[in-house]
């Protein structure tokens, strides 16, 4: 298994990327072809579904970015970490925790998001 922190940072970079084509390429690097993200208001599976998640996030939270706010705790192919969705002015819009599964190739196989504060 590759370094879980680097993997998590790659998938956050993909979600933060404002350009849809670049975001799609980053998604393909960070997630397995059948990878999934399940969040209370939205979910997507496969590279197409994950690209749609990214599009929706950028539409609803223009100028915001995800920041990891904790270390990545990982073992046995699973991980978890805390995050914040930070607006252009530096204020935190939402906080949460992601848990998930890492594939053998080091990419993300699954992400499940829990929002903690909105």
Give the role of each language-model region.
Residues 1-30:
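Short acidic-aromatic low-complexity motifs
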Residues 12, 36, 80-82:
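Short aromatic/hydrophobic contact patches that present stacked aromatics
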Residues 17-21, 40, 90:
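Alpha-helix boundary/capping and short turn/kink residues
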Residues 22-77:
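A solvent-exposed, acidic/Ser-Thr-rich amphipathic alpha-helical stretch
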């Amino acid at each position: 298994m590759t370094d879980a922190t680097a993997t998590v940072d790659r998938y956050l970079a993909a979600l933060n990327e404002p350009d849809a084509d670049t975001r799609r390429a980053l998604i393909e690097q960070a997630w397995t072809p059948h990878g999934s993200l399940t969040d209370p208001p939205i979910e997507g599976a496969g590279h197409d579904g994950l690209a749609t998640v990214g599009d929706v996030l950028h539409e609803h939270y223009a100028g915001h970015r995800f920041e990891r706010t904790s270390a990545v705790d990982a073992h046995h192919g699973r991980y978890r970490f805390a995050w914040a969705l930070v607006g252009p002015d530096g204020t935190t819009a939402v906080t949460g925790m992601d848990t998930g599964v890492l594939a053998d190739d080091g990419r993300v196989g699954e992400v499940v998001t829990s929002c903690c504060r909105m």
